[in-house]
Structures are given as C-alpha cells and as structure tokens.
Amino acid sequence: NEIGGVLIWKIPDFGFPPGEVDGFISRAKGKHTLILDLRGNPGGYVVTLEKFAGYFFEKDIKIADLKGRKPMDPQMAKSQGSNGFSGKVIVLIDSHSASAAEIFARLMQLEKRGVVIGDVSAGAVMQSRGVGFDAGSANIISYGMNLTNADVIMSDGKSLEHTGVIPDEIIVPSGRDLAERQDPVLSRALEIAGIRIDPAAAGKILPVEKFIERRSNVAIQLIW
C-alpha cells in the first residue's frame, strides 16, 4: 500500500532539458506531499529552473533579479496552471546544494510555498557565462573559463552569495549517521508529511551510492 501519498524526488542536478520537467511532475499528481531532495545538487540550467518553479505556483512568479553591469531581465517562473502541483512541498538541502538548487529553495521560503530542512546551502549563486579560446597553430589547444556576469538578488532584496539558504529546520547528519547510512533529514521530512520512519529506514529509501553513478539522471522514488 502507498503510505500517505508521499512522493520523494531526488534531483541530482538541474542539468536536464526543461522539456523533461512535464513528465516528472506528472508523477506527483494525486499525491498530497512532494519531498524534493536537492542535497548535493550543484545547480544547472536557468531555463530548467524557471520551468520547474512554474509548476508550484498558481500565477507567474519573479524568481530573482539579476544585477550586472548592464540591465538584465529577471528570472521568471511562468505558472503551469492546472498542470502544476498544489500539494505540500518539502525541500531538502545541504552544504553542497548550490546555484539553481538554493535559488529554488529560497524562492519556496519567500513565497511561503514550502518547508526547507537540512543544512545551510553553499552560497554560490552568481550567474556566469562560459568563454572559449584556441591557442597554437600546428597543434590547437582549446581552453576556456567562466566569467561571472551577474549577482542574483531574491525578492527580499538580498543575495545568497556567500551566505546560502538557512533552512526552516537545520538538521545535519552526524558522523555516526553517515557511517551507519542513516538519514535523519529525510526521516524528519516524512514526519512533517505525516509518516513516521526512523532514520535507519529512511537511509534505505535513497541510498547515496545510487545517485553517485547517475548524477545526470533524475531519480524518482515512490514510498510504498
């Protein structure tokens, strides 16, 4: 039997095409709670973040302003209307959650759309662009660099750079938790959703090893 209608969605990164979001969100239809595990998520495509965020709001939402040397359009989330998810949302983050992952987590806090639990995020959100170069004549050597071109300012007027997102509930796994593969963060998220599962059992739901080898894929786990 399904336990409480909770869907856990582990998202290793936002480096997937925005068109794939539709199929992922459809899995959440009919569930009363969606737990988004963004722990270890380094970020990804801005267009994917914008499309993804739009599924959680009934109206278009400004995600953040971009502050650069020249005027820039803000990051916007266009509401997906009836195709969106209207249930409870719980977001898990840690010190390795960066860029798009922490921007999304902070957006959910500011709009009072979800609860964020875990550890303070990385505080690495500045937007950058890649620049490529070639050197040499007979033997061409290609190299490149990323140049920061804008800071990201949230709706409260603050940047997350160097500060990160402070969770609504700070829960940091201990060394013993990690050694024994317990997950007190996911356990607490499930408790908020109305399901009591101890950290040891929660640690078996989303094993860390499962996602180290599949960082380019989005994994979905339904609690049964």
Predicted regions and their residues:
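Conserved functional hotspot residues or short segments at active or partner-binding sites
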Residues: 126, 161-163, 176-180, 184-224
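Flexible glycine/proline-enriched surface loops and loop-helix/loop-strand junctions
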Residues: 86-88, 170-174
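Residues in well-ordered beta-strands of folded domains
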Residues: 10, 64, 117, 146-153, ...
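Short acidic (Asp/Glu) and glycine-rich catalytic loops that position anionic groups and cofactors
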Residues: 31-33, 164-171
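Cleft-lining beta-strand/loop regions that shape enzyme active-site pockets
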Residues: 1-138
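Hydrophobic, well-ordered secondary-structure elements that form the walls
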Residues: 108, 157, 189
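A broadly conserved detector of short glycine/acidic/proline-rich loop/turn motifs that flank catalytic sites
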Residues: 12-13, 95-96, 120-121, 149-151, ...
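C-terminal structured "cap/appendage" subdomains that terminate the fold
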Residues: 130-132, 137-162, 166-167
